Amino acid sequence: MRTRKPLEDWDRRAFLQLLGVSALGLAVPGWKILAAERAGAKPLRGIFPVAQTPFTESNKLDLDALIEEVRFIDRGGVHGFVWPQMASEWMTLTEAERLEGSEAIASTGRKLRPAIVIGVQGPDVAIAIKYAKHAERVGADAIISLPPSENSDPKTDLEYYKAVGGATQLPLFVQAVGNMGVDLLIEMYKAIPTFRYVKDEAGSPLMSIGPLRQRSSDQLKIFSGSHGRDLIDEMRRGFSGSMPAAPFADLYAQTWDLWHEGKHDEAMAMHGRTLLFITEAVSHGPESLKYILYLRGVFKTYGLRTQRAPGFSSAVKLAAGSDQAETHLDEEGKQALRETLEYLKPYLRA
């Protein structure tokens, strides 16, 4: 079982005050009409990559490259775009960068096909609510949030997601990690009208989807993570989508589209090609994802940030591989990625 990535604790009194406000919101008539149910809403189904965050040579957020990443995803025929989450180095981003980046993504995405999902987790519940309201204001199609803390109990998780889900009418994705099991997710489903989507990275998602669908009368829609390694098995079992990384999302999207067109052999062949990139990414870590975007002309640089944004303690680990961890992209790794990209060029859309 995976360990939950710690965020920060919040002031409980302030949290309960905010929860009271959100509870009032849930009583407003019409609250249960979700954005996804309104005419013209983009479908929340398919390949929704968690985007990498580009930085300039001076380590500033590169908005132009971030906008180009949205366009790159659209050109690849990909179904959605998610930012910022763990793979986006979100704990290194300042509040101003989060707000500015979300607005740029939503504005660009409004004219394109992919649905835009904005990550709203933060060092406390008040800022998470602020991010959620901002996402709704700038026109995002949905929001997603990690849980509040490594050591939070199910009641605290439930209260947190009630507050975040009650802050807007946007559909809410809950990112299930650590020990967030089926019972807690079903309790959330019953208590939070906007919660209808799970990115499941807790325990064994392949084993959880059956009970989640059955106990929610198939109203909870399940997405996967973990680089989409089990995508074929997930589609067989009725997953509604996957949230892999962005650099080769066009390959995942082709796998998804082929499978749902009934071309299962072709889908499995395409997924086999995608696995070439997946193994390289796992071997060489998050910098390799940015390097592929650099090779594909989306990013101008591919370095990672190593400093946390204000509000996060030094005890909080950044993304896997980005905090002086086990993986490193060396020259041999770069050569391997270049050769893999060259081999797969005939299959790339973007």
Regions found by a protein language model. Name each.
Residues 46-48, 80, 115-117, 141-142, ...:
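Structural preference for beta-strand elements that scaffold enzyme active sites
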Residues 27-32:
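C-terminal segment of classical bacterial N-terminal signal peptides
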Residues 41, 54-55, 60-177:
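Active-site beta->alpha loop and helix N-cap motifs at the rims of alpha/beta catalytic domains
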Residues 2-23:
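N-terminal secretory signal peptides and thylakoid transit peptides that target proteins
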Residues 35-36, 41:
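Boundary at the C-terminal end of the N-terminal hydrophobic targeting segment
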Residues 108-114, 138-139, 168-170, 191-194, ...:
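Short helix-capping segments at alpha-helix termini
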